[in-house]
């Protein structure tokens, strides 16, 4: 019995078999299995939801520095859920440990916390570093937020072209905020040639993707009779 067999059962949707195998492996001290079993308890897969078991398993695995246990535990502390009190400082430390172990969403969370000074000293240059690390691994929100830093010159030298590239990548991935921000660049001619038609098209895409400000703009343009749809 190996973690690979347990993972295969889980990925095939055989949660009962996966739960049984993860339990055996977790009891034997396998940190990957502890993490997966904690996730199953958290989501009630082949078992009743159990916050205490989830916390116990994530904590054990995090002590062994299992990357996703660190990240999942950080989310609990960040939001004050799962039987723990809200603790931004603990959340930051756990996210940072996960980020250092190549977990892209943890890299993004570390960057976001550094940018806002949540659970740590505000540091725009460190935020830019971690946004870039997450973006390199395809994290769309990281591309978008890095683009904002390049646009405003926070933590990095202001760079119109890099800003445009970052927003473009976020938009290519279908991120509503990416569409909206890229549309603003085309509207302003920031990092690209001004193109109001492209700006409007991107604003529409953002609206269709659920962006509230874009919806408002499109609605106002329709009401004014400037566009049909």
Mark where each language-model region is.
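N-terminal segments that cap or nucleate solenoid repeat domains
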Residues: 1-36
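Hydrophobic face of amphipathic alpha-helices that form TPR/SEL1-like repeat modules
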Residues: 2-9, 36-43, 47, 70-79, ...
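Helix-turn-helix repeat elements of alpha-solenoid scaffolds
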Residues: 10-16, 50-51, 87-88, 123-124, ...
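Short helix-capping/linker turns of helical repeat alpha-solenoids
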Residues: 13, 27-30, 43-45, 63-67, ...
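Terminal, low-structured helical/coil segments at or just beyond the last alpha-helical repeat
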Residues: 205-229
